Amino acid sequence: MAEYRFLDDARWRGLCFFGCRIPGEKMVFGSCPSRDCIEGIADGFVIKPFDPQARVITIPFGEAEGKETYHEENTDFPYYPTAKAFYMKHAGIIIDYLRENPEKKVVYSRVLTCETRKSLTDIFETLCRTYPMAYVFCFRTPQTGLWIGASPELLGEFSKQSFKTVALAGTMLAARGGKWSDKNKREQKIVADYIRNILSTAEAKHIYEKDGEKIAGPVKHLITEFSATLPDDVKAETIIEQLSPTPALSGYPQYEAIEMIVEHEAYRRGCYGGFCGIHNHPVYGKSCLWVNLRSMRINASNQCAIYSGGGLMPDSEAEEEWLETERKATTLLSVL
């Protein structure tokens, strides 16, 4: 646990910082830089909020050297949980819209709130131990506030022209056997087709796909793993920005789905549904960016806002979608 204690130290000193554990790895990467965050994708820990218009920021690699900054954090914190009546009403409106537009999809989310007495060190260590195949991350900047999570969804792993990503969608209880529903299959197909189109448009070569399932805490998802070789004149960072947010986090068509999300969710998502991860790490040797998912934001009073969502389709039922968000939220609730 000692290797994680820098998280609490940096938090209470008011520093920008990050910590992350790559799935299947024992090493934890972390940094409390003496420099402020950098705008754009640079060498360091990259953070992109959900809003496509929001700017990417990077926490550079490095150590703090004793500097204390006490930055003022972004105060857009959702203090109140999404009421079930509100969720049911607005999910119902979206589902009715989708029944008239069956080729579309909207990812609708809600917030659960609680307080915790646990330290970041305790939460991070428990997430690493409980979810060994998740991407466990924690970061804080004045622009974003403090976030921590255990994501099951890779957005992009790349080194030079080698590129990997996944389509992850569809949800059912991990303990449940049987076949996947048509709704789940169609939901996942929308995401996979979206990724195929981006790779095809970029004229990527040697595209390989592998279908399967991925367990993430109490639930499991359909997954298609993609690997490809990008042309010499195509940057992996460009593909990342085209992918995010994928239909797994926004819906389809992307901008129309985002308009529905803004209209019907009672808060701003902030970093939930965006991405974060290490870029050009000198030891790891490659870049590894993950979707900010199964995550929560923590304010200075240790109030937690847990974000949980699911894909709405024409044949969705609002009550079942509500229960799905409950199951997904247990990833974090179980460690608090």
Model-based region annotation:
Residues 20-118, 160, 174, 182-186, ...:
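Non-catalytic accessory segments adjacent to catalytic cores
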Residues 46, 100-101, 156, 257, ...:
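A residue-level signal for conserved active-site and pocket-lining positions in enzyme catalytic cores
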Residues 64-85, 89-92, 115, 164-263:
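Contiguous alpha-helical scaffold segments within structured protein domains
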